[in-house]
């Protein structure tokens, strides 16, 4: 069912319920049959339903204990996430957050019917999941959540900056008339670091794929695909039968535990002193990170690991970036062999040939070699389809050859 159709059905259901009850905020429908055990919390805006679990610090989720993440300083997270403000807090002050919603694309008609948060507290990891038993309880749920976040200083999420937190901001505005800029808080959004590390080695970078292939997390049959969750919740609202809600609770619970494990793995990769322990794609991502923050020796070490990758696409990307790095350091002599390797790996790419032509013209003063590599660049370009980009590059190379011919003639 599309998100728009789901919103319309949810809206019709909500309007029907409001007609049937004049005090929906203070007198919500009782929990449905089969709802997981939890407690009802009283707030000034009505009740909220909370499911809470506590995990010992040595609890192992996949490859890591929950406590492992506490070994890292947030200064690393600040660099990885490009969020300097993260370095001013601590892991213990961050909230691991994930929501389950009535739609997968956001918008004013989308409601977060489950909000899960995890925090480190008193030598344990405390997981609190707020479940919306009835749409009329949303104000109570948001009020209770607000109390939980009063002592927080930032978030850890997976695409929370773009989805979960803007959605919650909207719900606070619509439900409580409260403008709360949650998306401006310090955030360690794991989506982008995960993509940088593994987009070239995994079939996709969904949380489910990453947790299985990088964290060794395997969910039980109790789990439910995320795409089915909005429909299951709508069925619950229509029927009152909450027997499937335990699967959603489990899904959200594992998501949050995975956030802890994934953050640990990402920070671990970026703190490795020896790049030989990294895969090629990981080394390339780490090299770029070190280069961005000015740790050039560490960047070079990681680049050298990445160019040894067994994956051709990783190796080619690494060679392009490493030769650009060598050029920026005025170490072109060291780049010659790498450009030649790039040409052999990507015979349709004229860029390595053009760089070699430039080198031999301007730095080695070998016009014959410069002409040879410019001609080779045209051979590469001849494999391209006709188009403006091909014509543009072809013209640039011919201009180069013309200049080289004049230089050779003058000589």
Language model regions located:
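Conserved DEDDh/DEDDy metal-dependent 3′-5′ exonuclease domain
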Residues: 122-217
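Short coil turns that delineate tetratricopeptide repeat
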Residues: 311-313, 347, 382
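Acidic, Mg2+-coordinating catalytic module of metal-dependent nucleases/exonucleases
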Residues: 196, 202-277
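N-terminal accessory regions of nucleic-acid-interacting proteins
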Residues: 1-91, 286
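Structural register within alpha-helical repeat arrays
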Residues: 286, 321-322, 356, 370, ...
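Residue at a conserved register position within TPR or TPR-like alpha-solenoid repeats
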Residues: 290, 326, 360-361, 405
